[in-house]
Amino acid sequence: MENLSDRFNALQDQLMNIYETAANTLESQIEHWQTLRKEAVLLYFARQNGVTRLGYQVVPTLAISEAKAKQAIGMVLQLQSLQKSQFGSEPWSLVDTSGETFRSAPENHFKKGPVSVEVIYDNDKDNANAYTMWKHIYYQDDDEQWHKSASGVNHTGIYYMQGTFRNYYVLFADDATRYSKTGHWEVKVNKETVFTPVTSSTPPESPGGQADSNTSSKTPTTATDSTSRLSPADSRKQSQQANTKGRRYGRRPSSRTRRTTETRQRRRSRSKSRSRSRSRSRLRSRSRSQSSERRSRYRSRSRSRQKEVSRITTTTRGRGRGSSSTSSKRSQRARGRGRGGSRGRRSSSTSPTSSKRSRRESESSRQRGISPSDVGKSLQSVSSRNTGRLGRLLDEALDPPVILVRGDPNTLRCFRNRAKQKFTGLYRAFSTAWSWVAGDGTERLGRSRMLISFFSFNQRRDFDQTVKYPKGVDRSFGSFDSL
């Protein structure tokens, strides 16, 4: 008991010396967190052995001491990694390396230079909310290399540049749904108006809205986005401009290039006309074959009816030498039998065609699509029956597949950004980074998670085989009844 108290007092003295010195070096900050780790381990050991007090200090529970020790270990590892980078020689204070600053938005990042940002909703000064923008943000990429980025603010929110990508860590629209009634807000930085009130229905930098001229010049647009928004006339002009740019000193193409281009155009036009004529001939042959099949079926049915009628009349004539009443009754019975037989034969002859029609109708109704309410209904995997590519896609739409990735939140965000730039078309959508919360508290459980949705299982398979997952990120497959 006395030995634990002496060690605890020694650790308290070390912490007081660090606080009084207030050295702005990473070595001092690492020593501070190492001392906090030793203190948490000592308190954990004391509580485990039934000690509830060390002098005037109340020993916390095992869970609290364990959480503080893990936090201190994580901070020591982060600071040691930062010390090896080019930013290790910069001044770092206790506030810059504190746990509260490290966990504030953007989470798990070192930050410096806080700036107050005030957002006024509905032009009401009393209805305002304060945010913190950081001048400098330090983050790690997938290769565990440290980068220093500048932070900025616009009408959409507060962001920091991650290469050419704007990573927003505060979105004003999220709080506008709670505080604003008209959907308008005004952004002020250091009590100076930066953005005047604008409606939140189509804010800049958001899907469907236009970016500001000042901010749009900083982020380059990709070639796919610019070409997809052009009209056919604009695309022709763009191709002509590209051709003129390719010419050197504005000269016209030589006669050889003209001839080659003309021959290529002629070949393309000929191939197109041939393909059109072939498709027309195929359609004509199909229509002729279908009409011939219908005629042959109709002739066979009429012949069978004539044979039945002739056979019935011969039997009635042979037996009609008796009384006229009996012959008339028998002929009526024979006619009834003949009609019934012909009907029976007609039904038997038309049964395969009706089954084919029902199959075609079911296939056509299935290939037309599924209703929105049926999307995500099936919880079973798609069967391997021969339904065609379109039918398989429609069956898979009933059970949308997903991939759940787990890892560090910053690593998951970098992975999402890289996938959007390199692997567009191999997935449907990405979710934001999220985590599970304990049922009896607010502490987060495990690592951060992110969902990736797909249109089909084949698309998920192609994505999984093509994309390289970052180090420390694992995945699992699943599906939902709806998204």
Swiss-Prot record:
Keyword Transmembrane helix: no
Compositionally biased residues, Basic residues: 245-258, 265-287, 330-346
Region Disordered, residue ranges: 196-384
Main location: host cell
Keyword Ligase: no
SUPFAM superfamilies, per database record: E2 regulatory, transactivation domain, Viral DNA-binding domain
Biased composition (Polar residues): 211-230
Modification note: Phosphorylated.
Function: Plays a role in the initiation of viral DNA replication. A dimer of E2 interacts with a dimer of E1 in order to improve specificity of E1 DNA binding activity. Once the complex recognizes and binds DNA at specific sites, the E2 dimer is removed from DNA. E2 also regulates viral transcription through binding to the E2RE response element (5'-ACCNNNNNNGGT-3') present in multiple copies in the regulatory regions of the viral genome. Activates or represses transcription depending on E2RE's position with regards to proximal promoter elements including the TATA-box.
Family that this chain belongs to: Belongs to the papillomaviridae E2 protein family.
Name this protein carries in UniProt: Regulatory protein E2
